A protein has these predicted regions:
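Conserved beta-strand elements of the Class I
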Residues: 4-8
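C-terminal accessory helical subdomains adjacent to catalytic cores in phosphodiester-
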Residues: 1-2, 15-36, 44-61, 66-179
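Acidic donor-binding loop at a coil-to-helix junction in glycosyltransferase catalytic cores
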Residues: 9-13
Length: 179
């Protein structure tokens, strides 16, 4: 019997990334995959939602940026305090922020085409770093993000960002013989 999967994400950039890149790959395993941005929802409502998802025997992935926490463990502790119904096994920590996952998927050829740096690692890339790298030809950061997603390379992203590699491996998102 298939279930439903809820991917809990912080904001709209996460919705865009998970909706375009991750949801289509997880959909065959579930009756439905829903992406739920939780940052603007009251804590109590998120807690009730997490509890109801578990009671209905559905699955969820709870995604959070590490931001400026010292470690994944520290970030998880903050989430445990904030959301009493959260299951630690369902937490995915993005290092550093979702923008680092976007940028990780840019191949050398695409970086050259866009006129941007081909970073060997995006593990320390912040939202501010990402914004500073947006080429002038794009009207907005959203346009730039859509352009990245058009040619996003899972293989490149798993090499350039450790937390993306860990996520992809854990949920068997992309089958790469090197992972």
């Amino acid at each position: 019997m298939k279930k439903r999967l809820f991917i809990m994400v912080e904001g709209e950039d996460d919705v865009r990334f998970f909706g375009r890149m991750i949801k289509p790959l997880l959909l065959p395993r579930y009756d439905s995959v829903e992406i739920v941005p939780y940052a603007c929802i009251k804590r109590e409502k998120v807690n009730k939602f997490l509890k109801s998802v578990s009671l209905m025997k559905n699955d969820y992935i709870f995604v959070a940026d590490i931001d400026f926490e010292y470690s994944v463990r520290d970030k998880k502790q903050i989430l445990y305090c904030r959301f009493s119904n959260i299951d630690g096994g369902s937490i995915v920590i993005v290092i550093r922020e979702i923008e680092s996952w976007y940028y990780a998927g840019i191949t050398g050829a695409v970086a050259q085409e866009l006129g941007i740096a081909d970073l060997p690692s995006t593990d320390d890339l912040t939202k501010e770093d990402f914004n500073a790298r947006i080429p002038k030809k794009f009207d907005s950061r959203i346009d730039f993000m859509f352009e990245i997603l058009k040619s996003f390379s899972f293989e490149t992203a798993t090499r350039k960002n450790q937390s993306f590699h860990d996520f992809v491996s854990r949920y068997r998102i992309y089958e790469n013989p090197e992972i």
